[in-house]
């Protein structure tokens, strides 16, 4: 599942799909807080969507994710999120987002192949608020930048255009 959050074009022209980052350190906070262990992690480190037969709809996973990725489907009473198209990637196929991306901004492959084909520095360390998270998803940054500080980038962008901080509301898939 790829989620694209609402974009208010009067404040921003950037778009980014909200992909699961498949956190590795700390190990998948969404899975750690699930009281019924509905969110499983594959041996390859892919954090799976909640198992429907186990999910009790407590939404702990939604609140625990530092990236705001899991969404709760009220109708299905189930958490939904990207599972890296595990049915495809476990068969050595690209996930649909990477397959469909016309500019290859979303790319799937191993680290060595990635660094041979791309310019910049691939990092998997992200600062989000006060938390630093290491993930299995890499971002390409300038060589001198060792981590992606999302909070600082958002504050910098808001300051440039004089935009107020957004109101935080819970997001639900309906």
Language-model segments: residues:
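Non-ligating segments of multi-cofactor redox enzymes
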Residues: 1-174
């Amino acid at each position: 599942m790829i989620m694209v959050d609402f974009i208010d074009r009067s404040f921003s022209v950037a778009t980014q799909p909200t992909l699961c980052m498949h956190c590795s350190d700390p190990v998948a906070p969404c899975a750690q807080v699930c009281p019924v262990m509905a969110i499983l992690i594959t041996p390859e480190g892919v954090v799976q969507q909640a198992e429907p037969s186990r999910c009790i709809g407590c939404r702990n996973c939604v609140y625990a994710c530092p990236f705001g990725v899991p969404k709760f489907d009220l109708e299905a009473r189930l958490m939904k999120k990207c599972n890296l198209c595990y049915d495809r990637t476990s068969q050595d196929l690209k996930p649909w987002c990477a397959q469909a991306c016309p500019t290859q901004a979303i790319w799937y492959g191993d680290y060595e192949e990635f660094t041979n084909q791309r310019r910049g520095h691939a990092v998997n360390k992200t600062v989000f608020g006060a938390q630093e998270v290491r993930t299995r998803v890499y971002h390409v940054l300038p060589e001198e930048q060792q981590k992606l500080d999302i909070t600082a980038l958002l504050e910098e962008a808001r300051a440039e255009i004089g935009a107020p901080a957004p109101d935080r509301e819970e997001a639900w898939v309906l």
